[in-house]
UniProtKB/Swiss-Prot annotation:
UniProt xrefs under PANTHER family: ATP-DEPENDENT CLP PROTEASE PROTEOLYTIC SUBUNIT, ATP-DEPENDENT CLP PROTEASE PROTEOLYTIC SUBUNIT, MITOCHONDRIAL
Keywords: Chloroplast, Hydrolase, Plastid, Protease, Serine protease
GO MF, any single term: ATP-dependent peptidase activity
Subunit structure: Component of the chloroplastic Clp protease core complex.
Pfam families named in the record: CLP_protease
Source species: Chlamydomonas reinhardtii (Chlamydomonas smithii)
Protein name as it appears in the record: ATP-dependent Clp protease proteolytic subunit
Subcellular locations according to the entry: Plastid, Chloroplast stroma
Residue span of region Disordered: 74-96
E.C. designation(s): 3.4.21.92
Residue segments, region Insertion IS1: 60-345
Length: 524
C-alpha cells in the first residue's frame, strides 16, 4: 500500500468485528466507491459485491414499506380523500385530466430518455447504411440484372419523417417526372390489370405469359406504378343498398354464406333504425332517473349516522386530508415530497474514478452493478478514465456523470493473447469479437450514438479530452467549483446519515464489551 493512503475503521454490522479499511480501493461509508488503481479481479469483486448488497438492502426496505401500507398501519395523509374543490374541478374537466404522478413515478420515469427520438434516429441510420451499401455494390453489378435491388433502393430513398403527409407516403415514389408521367399514363394501369388477370388464369402451357410474369415482374410493374393516395373509401357504407341488391339477386341465395351475410346486414339495419332521437331521449331519461335514485339513497344513508357526528369528529381528525384547506394541504404535500427526495438522495452511490483500466470483463461487471442502484449513481472522473474505467464512468446515471477539466478518457477494443490449438484460438477469437460488440452496445446506449460509429472509434486507441468526452456522450458536465460544491453537499448528507449509524454500532459494541468485562470481573 502506498504511503499516505488514509485508512478508517468501519463496522459492517452488529455481528461482524470492526476493521481497518483502505478508502482508495474499497467502499467508504457504504455509498462511496474509489476506483483509483488497476481494476483487477479482487477490486472488482469487492465493489460489485457491496453494490449488490446495497441494492438488496434498499429493495428489502421497499418491500417492508409496501407490506406496512398493505396491512393498513401508519397510512400517510396523502392517501386520504380529495377535497371538494379538487373534486369539482375534476368533474368540470370531465375526467380528461391525467392522474397526478407520485414522487417515485417521477424519479423512475423514462420520459427524459427520448426513446421515440432514438428509435427514429436508428431508423435513419439503418436506412443510410443500407443505401451506402447499395451504392458501393452498384459498381460490381447492374440494377437491371437484379430488379429487387432497384426496388429496394427506391424504398430506401423514401422520407419516413413524421411531418410528412400521409398521402405522400406512397409505396413507390412519384417525386421524379418519369414516375409522375407513368402514373398519369392509363396504359400502365391497363397493363397492370391485364397481367393480374393472366396471373389468376395462369396455365402451364402459355409461354408468353411466363416471359411476362417471371419472378421479378411485380417489382418491374410496381416501379412504374406510383399512386398518390392509398386511402381507399370503404365500399360498404350504404348497408341498405347492399341489402336490397343481395336480396334481388337469385343466383347465390341458396348458399349458406350469402344467407348469413344477408342476416347480418339486416340486423345492422334494424339496429340503426332503432337509434332514433325519441328512443335515445327515453333511454337517457331512464339512466338519469337511476342515477338520481342512487344519489338519494347514498345521501339518506350518510345523513342517518355519518353526517351527525362529522362536525364533532372534525376537530379531532387531524389526519383527514379533506378537512385541511388548500394552503396547509400544499405545504404538507411539499414537505412529504422534500422528505422523499432527500431519502432518495441519501441512497445514491458516488464513484470517484482515476484509473488506467483493467480487464474488460471487470469493467462490464462494474457497469452492470451500477445499474442495480435504483436511486442512481454519480460518477466523477479525476485525471484518467481509460479502457475499462471508461465503462464505469459511462455506467453512471445519465445527467450525473462528471469529469474534471484536466481529465482524459480513452476507449479501445478488447485485446488479449491467445495460445493453444488452432481450433481453440478460433473459438476464443470469436468470443473476443462478441465481447467487442457488447462493449460497443454499452457505449452506444450511454452516448446515444449508433453502434457502427462506436465500432469504428474502437478500432484503435481513441483518446478524448474533457470537452470531447462531453461531446462524445461519455460524460455530461465538467466538474467546476459549483458542481463540486453540490457534490460535496450530497456526499455530506450520505456521510451524516451513515455517521449516525456507525456511532450507534460502535456504542452498542462498546456496551457489549463493557458488560462482558464486568461479568468477567465479578466471576473472578
Amino acid at each position: 500500500m502506498p504511503i499516505g493512503v488514509p485508512r478508517i475503521i468501519y463496522c459492517w454490522g452488529e455481528e461482524l468485528p470492526a476493521q481497518w479499511t483502505d478508502i482508495y480501493n474499497f467502499i467508504f461509508r457504504r455509498r462511496m466507491v474509489f476506483l483509483m488503481q488497476y481494476l483487477d479481479d479482487e477490486l472488482c469483486n469487492q465493489i460489485c459485491g457491496l453494490l449488490i448488497n446495497i441494492h438488496m438492502e434498499d429493495r428489502s426496505k421497499e418491500l417492508e414499506k409496501k407490506e406496512m401500507e398493505k396491512s393498513g398501519l401508519f397510512k400517510s395523509g396523502t392517501a386520504k380523500t380529495k377535497g371538494k374543490d379538487t373534486v369539482k374541478k375534476e368533474n368540470l374537466s370531465g375526467g380528461a385530466s391525467a392522474k397526478r404522478q407520485s414522487v417515485e413515478d417521477l424519479l423512475t420515469s423514462d420520459n427524459d430518455f427520448g426513446i421515440e427520438e432514438n428509435h427514429l434516429l436508428e431508423q435513419y441510420t439503418l436506412q443510410k447504411i443500407t443505401t451506402e451499401w447499395l451504392n458501393w455494390n452498384a459498381q460490381f453489378f447492374d440494377y437491371s440484372d437484379e430488379p429487387y435491388l432497384y426496388y429496394l433502393a427506391d424504398i430506401l430513398s423514401k422520407d419516413f419523417s413524421p411531418n410528412q403527409d400521409k398521402d405522400s407516403a406512397n409505396l413507390n415514389f412519384a417525386k421524379s417526372s418519369a414516375n409522375k408521367q407513368a402514373f398519369q399514363n392509363p396504359a400502365e394501369m391497363t397493363k397492370l390489370i391485364k397481367n393480374l388477370k393472366n396471373l389468376k388464369n395462369f396455365s402451364t402451357g402459355s409461354k408468353n405469359v411466363k416471359q411476362n410474369l417471371d419472378v421479378y415482374s411485380p417489382f418491374r410493374l410496381l416501379a412504374n406504378f406510383a399512386p398518390q393516395n392509398y386511402n381507399l373509401e370503404h365500399p360498404n357504407q350504404n348497408l341498405a343498398e347492399i341489402y336490397s341488391l343481395l336480396k334481388t339477386s337469385t343466383q347465390n341465395t341458396n348458399q349458406p354464406f350469402t344467407k348469413k351475410l344477408i342476416d347480418n346486414l339486416s340486423h345492422k339495419e334494424l339496429m340503426n333504425r332503432l337509434q332514433s332521437p325519441e328512443k335515445l331521449v327515453a333511454s337517457s331519461e331512464k339512466a338519469l332517473g337511476r342515477r338520481r335514485l342512487k344519489q338519494r339513497y347514498v345521501q339518506e344513508r350518510l345523513g342517518s349516522g355519518g353526517l351527525s357526528n362529522s362536525k364533532a369528529l372534525k376537530a379531532y381528525n387531524y389526519l383527514d386530508q379533506g378537512a385541511l384547506n388548500n394552503e396547509s394541504g400544499r405545504s404538507l404535500y411539499r414537505k412529504q415530497t422534500e422528505r422523499v427526495i432527500q431519502e432518495e438522495e441519501s441512497k445514491k452511490v458516488f464513484m470517484i474514478i482515476n484509473s488506467f483500466g483493467g480487464s474488460v470483463g471487470n469493467g462490464i461487471t462494474v457497469h452492470d452493478a451500477l445499474q442495480f442502484i435504483k436511486a442512481g449513481s454519480l460518477t466523477l472522473a479525476l485525471g484518467v478514465a481509460a479502457s475499462a474505467a471508461s465503462l464505469a464512468l459511462a455506467g453512471g446515471t445519465i445527467g450525473e456523470r462528471y469529469v474534471t477539466e484536466g481529465c482524459h478518457t480513452m476507449i479501445h477494443q478488447p485485446e488479449g493473447g491467445l495460445n493453444g490449438q488452432a481450433s481453440d484460438i478460433w473459438i476464443d477469437s470469436q468470443e473476443i469479437m462478441k465481447i467487442r460488440l457488447d462493449v460497443a452496445e454499452i457505449y452506444s446506449l450511454s452516448t446515444y450514438r449508433p453502434r457502427h460509429k462506436i465500432l469504428r472509434d474502437l478500432d484503435r486507441d481513441f483518446y478524448l479530452t474533457a470537452m470531447e468526452t462531453i461531446y462524445y456522450g461519455l460524460a455530461d458536465e465538467i466538474a467546476t467549483n459549483e458542481v463540486m460544491h453540490s457534490i460535496v453537499e450530497m456526499t455530506n448528507q450520505v456521510w451524516s446519515y451513515h455517521d449516525s449509524k456507525q456511532e450507534r454500532l460502535l456504542e452498542s459494541r462498546a456496551s457489549l464489551v463493557g458488560d462482558s468485562t464486568q461479568t468477567q470481573e465479578s466471576n473472578s
